[in-house]
Regions:
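Structured, acidic catalytic/metal-binding patches in enzyme active sites
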Residues: 49, 53, 58-270
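Sec-dependent N-terminal signal peptides
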Residues: 1-23
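Short, well-ordered alpha-helical scaffold segments within catalytic/effector domains
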Residues: 4, 87, 275-279
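Intrinsically disordered, low-complexity proline-rich regions
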Residues: 2, 34-37, 315
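N- or domain-start disorder-to-order transition segments that initiate the globular core
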Residues: 24-68
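A cross-kingdom marker for long, charged
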Residues: 264-328
Length: 328
């Protein structure tokens, strides 16, 4: 279960697109004297023409209010299929807002992330990633690269966190789950269309640096977990997506809490510490009038140490917005 939560916890997944190295071209080792290798190309998720219409989703929404400030808290599913969700109380709240705030602003041109990837994702120590994997995990990496049309050495010079993220996102895309359908992308497009202010709680570089701050062993643990569970993604994804679509916060809470049991340190890094930071940001924003629509990964609004519980410690109460079905 951690494999998807690892990507789903970050807005980076919503804006991330892999590079465009030609399929079948080996990535050379990186060194300070030569350009960083490009990761294998990411396939674009394509809807199945004969697929049945996807069900309408009713994800959870919260609100924090005082006399002159309203802050909506919307939990997103960063990588999503084409099911409709931008309606009902979510659309009403967004339309009433004058500012959109994301974990990280989604760049209009995903290629703009390339310099950041080159700065942080390359292992310049000279170590080869396959040399650090067991024979079974090396074979799993080769199998994972095959659908991308990438050679076995495509990730030799990349850090484990980047390989984990890339494999998770591309595997999701092969299931028709894409950042193109994700709430961050759709909300950003809607905000730009009405010239709405867009802010961020962290930013792409901050999130990349957080990935990069994990210890080497933590990164390797995530990569091993990813390689050993990619084939289970359809079964892993289904309950998470169902809980999000139904606004079932209790089920999401069980999933998030279970994901943190094996590595409390990573759970604190990805969830607890960031949730506390965001609660403090909201406290400061409540001092100024206006209406703000905050969209962050749903896992941050579901775990036992979620943003709402952090807000309670600061004296603010987040209440669930009732679902009201409207014609659409």
């Amino acid at each position: 279960m951690k494999i998807l939560l690892f990507a789903a916890a970050f807005g980076l997944a919503a804006g991330y697109q892999a590079g465009s190295a030609p399929a079948g071209q080996a990535a050379p080792p990186a060194s300070p004297a030569q350009p960083a290798p490009a990761p294998p190309a990411t396939p674009t998720a394509q809807p199945t023409p004969s697929a049945a219409p996807l069900p309408d989703a009713d994800p959870a929404l919260w609100v924090v209010r005082d006399t002159d400030t309203t802050v909506y808290l919307f939990g997103t599913f960063h990588l999503l299929d084409g099911r409709p969700w931008f309606n009902d109380e979510v659309r009403t709240a967004f339309d009433a807002s004058d500012e959109l705030v994301l974990e990280a602003i989604i760049p209009e041109n995903p290629a703009s992330l390339a310099p950041l990837i080159q700065s942080y994702a390359i292992d310049r120590s000279g170590r080869k990633l396959p040399d650090r994997l067991s024979a079974g995990d090396r074979a799993a990496l080769v199998r994972a690269l095959a659908p991308l049309g990438a050679p076995a050495n495509a990730f030799d010079s990349f850090k484990p966190w980047f390989v984990s993220l890339t494999l998770t996102v591309t595997a999701a895309q092969r299931l028709g789950i894409s950042s193109n359908n994700g709430p961050e992308t759709i909300l950003s497009q809607a905000a730009r269309a009405r010239q709405m202010r867009i802010g961020e709680l962290e930013g792409m570089e901050w999130q990349i640096r957080l990935f990069d701050s994990m210890t080497d062993e933590q990164q390797m643990e995530q990569l091993r977990e990813t390689l050993r569970n990619l084939d289970r993604m359809p079964r892993t994804l289904a309950p998470m997506l169902a809980a999000w679509s139904e606004g079932d916060v209790n089920q999401l809470r069980r999933i998030v809490n279970a994901s943190g049991g094996d590595s409390p340190a990573i759970h604190r890094l990805i969830y607890t510490n960031r949730n506390a930071n965001w609660a403090r940001w909201i406290r400061e924003r409540m001092a100024r009038p206006g209406t703000v629509f905050i969209a962050v990964g749903a896992a941050h609004l579901a775990g036992t140490d979620n943003v709402q519980s952090q807000l309670r410690r600061l004296g603010f109460r987040a209440t669930r917005v009732p679902h009201v079905e409207t014609a659409h």
